[in-house]
């Protein structure tokens, strides 16, 4: 699997250390193992996980600005854990309301010795915003409107929302509240992944 990951990374133009690659493969191994009992993802094949979970997460890394991020509705740690592995100087709070997912995240944290993640079991609306985050990240979590409404308290003054989407959600962009606007839309290239992928970056218009 390490060889396949190396080929995918080369195809995507992403350079990682051998240690980072080893951690990513170890995470996939754990996800595959725990998935049989905990049903953490509909993707069953570890090789498919490399594309649909690992590559699909880390292609976002170049667009993130700041040091403190929160991954809302992280599920089994996506995209937060792959991003934490490739961005070791940043910190990621991994938020999910389901206990079985958070137990898995804590086990990943322990086994992979990831010191830059904090798994938290909480609903996003109930999570405190102090200190504020540089970025709020979601992947298939909610509509853009719901994301900014439920998470409005989390980013700092210059913080951003980073929403990973499939096709460009024009209707969701059009229905954003007036307090928020789209700063940019980045088309993402994920080797061997069918369909479009976009990153929508949103900022607050409040002064």
From Swiss-Prot:
Binding site for S-adenosyl-L-methionine: 73, 78, 124-125, 139
Entry's EC annotation: 2.1.1.170
Gene3D superfamilies in UniProt: Vaccinia Virus protein VP39
GO molecular function, one term: rRNA (guanine-N7-)-methyltransferase activity
GO CC field: cytosol
Alphabetical keyword list: Cytoplasm, Methyltransferase, rRNA processing, S-adenosyl-L-methionine, Transferase
Keyword 4Fe-4S: no
Keyword Transferase applies: yes
Pfam families assigned: GidB
Catalytic function, reaction form: guanosine(527) in 16S rRNA + S-adenosyl-L-methionine = N(7)-methylguanosine(527) in 16S rRNA + S-adenosyl-L-homocysteine
Localization: Cytoplasm
Recorded family membership: Belongs to the methyltransferase superfamily. RNA methyltransferase RsmG family.
Task performed by this protein: Specifically methylates the N7 position of guanine in position 527 of 16S rRNA.
Xref: PANTHER family: S-ADENOSYL-L-METHIONINE-DEPENDENT METHYLTRANSFERASES SUPERFAMILY PROTEIN
Record-given protein name: Ribosomal RNA small subunit methyltransferase G
UniProt organism field: Salmonella schwarzengrund (strain CVM19633)
Gene: rsmG
